[in-house]
C-alpha cells in the first residue's frame, strides 16, 4: 500500500509539473497602471499564433466555406470500404472527444475566474482554432494508412509526423492531394518539379504518441471523477459504485470490434441535442434577462471596468485557455478520428473538423455559459466546478436539471 501511495504521489508531481509548464504563466506582462497583468502560458504562445497564421494562410477558409462545411458533413461515404466511417461519423467521434469537462466545468471555471467577458474570448479562440483543426485533420487524411486490425483507415499526428517530409516547392493547388504515398507516381503524373529534403520525423511521432497517451488517460480520469462526484452530490451514490459501472460500460464498448463508432453515432447526437434543447428552454424562460447577459459578456470583455480594475488579463487568459482546452484545436485528438473517415478529398474532412470546433465552443460551451449566467448570484454563491453548474441547473429546472 505504501509503494502504491508513493507511485501515485510521483504521478501527481509529474502531472502537476507538466501542467505548470504547459498551462502555467511562462511570463507575465504588466501594464503601466501596475494592476493589469497578462499571464502568458506556453500553449497559448504556440496555439494562438499558429491559429492566426493558418487563418491568414488559408485566407480565412473556415469562414469563407462555412456553407460548404455543412454540405460535406452530410455527404455519404465515397466507397464501401469495410471498417471505414463517413465524414459525419468522424465528426461525431471528434465531437465526443472534444465535448467533456472543458464544456461544463471548464466554462464554469472560466467565468468564475474571468467573469462573463471570458465567454467572448472563448468564442474568439474557437474562430482562430478552427483553422488549426482544418490543417491538422487534412494532414491526417493525406497520410492515413490501412488498418490491418479493424479494417478501414487509421492515422493522426503521430502518423504524419513519422511519414511527412519537408516539401520546399509544390504548387498551391497541389498541397492537398488524394494520395501522396507514392511520391514518384505523384511527380510523374503531374510533371511537377518536386523537391524534398531532410528525413522522416520519427522521433516527433513517437513523442506525440507517448504524450497523447498520458494526456488522454488523464482526461478520461478527470471526466470520470466529475461524473462520480456529480452522482454523489445529486443522489448520494457512492463514487466507487459509479466508477465500477463506468468501467464496465466502457469495457463493453471499447473491447468490442467497431462498437465505439456505433455507440457514439447514437449517443452523441442525442446528448448534444438534448443539452441544446434544455438551454434553449432556459433562455426562452429567462428571455427578459438575455440582453443583460449579452451586455455583460461584451462589456466585461472590452469595457473600462476590467481594465481599470486590473482584471482584463484574467478575463482574456481564462477565456482563451478554457477555449483551447475545450475545442482541442491543435491538440491532435480530432485528427485521429478524421483519418478514419472515407471521403473523396482530404480537404472535406478538414472542413468537417473545423465545423466540429464551432459546434464545441460556439454552441455547447455557450449553452453552459448561458445556463450559469442566467442564474441569480444567490443560487450559485460559494460554489465551484460541477457543483456550481448543478446548482444553476437546479434553479432553472429543479431536480430534472440536476439529472
Where are the regions a protein language model picked out?
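Select transmembrane alpha-helical segments in multipass membrane proteins
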Residues: 44-50, 85-94, 197-214, 243-244, ...
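Extracellular/periplasmic helix-exit of transmembrane alpha-helices
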Residues: 136-145, 280-296, 304, 310, ...
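N-terminal alpha-helical transmembrane segments of multi-pass membrane transport
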Residues: 1-101, 111-118, 129
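Alpha-helical membrane segments and immediately flanking helix-loop junctions
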Residues: 80-113, 139-142, 149-164, 203, ...
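Selective recognition of specific alpha-helical transmembrane segments in multi-pass small-molecule
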Residues: 128-136, 239-257, 268-288, 321-324, ...
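Transmembrane alpha-helical segments and their short flanking loops
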Residues: 2-24, 116, 144-149, 163, ...
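Membrane-interface loop-to-helix entry segments
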Residues: 46, 54-70, 204, 208, ...
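Helix-loop-helix module between adjacent transmembrane segments
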Residues: 53-55, 96, 125-153, 158, ...
Amino acid at each position: 500500500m505504501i509503494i502504491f501511495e508513493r507511485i501515485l504521489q510521483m504521478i501527481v508531481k509529474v502531472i502537476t509539473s507538466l501542467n505548470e509548464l504547459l498551462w502555467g504563466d511562462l511570463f507575465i506582462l504588466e501594464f503601466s497602471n501596475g494592476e493589469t497583468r497578462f499571464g502568458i502560458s506556453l500553449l497559448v504562445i504556440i496555439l494562438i499564433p499558429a491559429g492566426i497564421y493558418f487563418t491568414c494562410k488559408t485566407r480565412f477558409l473556415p469562414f469563407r466555406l462555412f456553407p460548404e462545411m455543412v454540405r460535406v458533413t452530410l455527404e455519404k461515404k465515397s466507397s464501401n470500404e469495410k471498417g471505414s466511417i463517413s465524414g459525419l461519423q468522424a465528426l461525431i467521434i471528434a465531437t465526443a472527444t472534444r465535448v467533456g469537462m472543458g464544456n461544463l466545468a471548464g466554462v464554469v471555471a472560466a467565468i468564475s475566474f474571468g467573469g462573463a467577458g471570458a465567454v467572448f474570448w472563448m468564442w474568439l479562440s474557437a474562430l482562430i482554432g478552427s483553422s488549426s483543426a482544418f490543417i491538422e485533420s487534412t494532414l491526417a487524411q493525406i497520410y492515413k494508412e490501412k488498418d490491418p486490425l479493424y479494417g478501414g483507415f487509421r492515422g493522426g499526428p503521430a502518423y504524419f509526423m513519422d511519414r511527412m517530409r519537408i516539401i520546399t516547392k509544390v504548387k498551391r493547388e497541389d498541397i492537398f492531394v488524394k494520395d501522396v504515398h507514392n511520391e514518384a507516381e505523384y511527380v510523374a503524373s503531374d510533371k511537377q518539379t518536386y523537391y524534398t529534403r531532410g528525413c522522416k520525423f520519427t522521433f516527433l511521432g513517437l513523442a506525440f504518441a507517448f504524450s497523447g497517451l498520458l494526456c488522454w488517460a488523464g482526461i478520461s480520469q478527470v471526466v470520470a471523477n466529475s461524473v462520480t462526484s456529480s452522482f454523489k452530490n445529486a443522489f448520494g451514490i457512492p463514487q466507487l459504485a459509479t466508477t465500477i459501472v463506468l468501467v464496465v460500460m466502457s469495457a463493453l464498448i471499447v473491447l468490442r470490434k467497431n462498437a465505439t463508432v456505433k455507440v457514439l453515432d447514437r449517443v452523441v447526437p442525442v446528448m448534444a441535442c438534448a443539452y441544446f434543447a434544455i438551454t434553449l428552454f432556459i433562455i426562452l424562460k429567462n428571455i427578459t434577462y438575455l440582453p443583460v447577459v449579452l451586455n455583460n459578456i461584451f462589456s466585461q470583455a472590452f469595457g473600462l471596468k476590467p481594465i481599470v480594475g486590473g482584471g482584463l488579463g484574467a478575463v482574456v487568459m481564462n477565456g482563451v485557455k478554457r477555449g483551447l482546452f475545450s475545442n482541442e484545436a491543435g491538440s491532435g485528438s480530432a485528427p485521429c478520428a478524421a483519418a478514419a473517415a472515407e471521403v473523396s478529398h482530404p480537404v472535406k474532412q478538414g472542413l468537417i473538423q473545423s465545423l466540429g470546433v464551432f459546434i464545441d465552443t460556439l454552441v455547447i460551451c455557450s449553452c453552459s455559459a448561458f445556463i450559469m449566467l442566467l442564474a441569480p448570484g444567490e443560487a450559485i454563491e460559494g460554489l465551484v466546478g460541477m457543483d456550481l453548474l448543478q446548482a444553476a441547473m437546479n434553479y432553472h429546472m429543479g431536480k430534472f436539471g440536476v439529472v
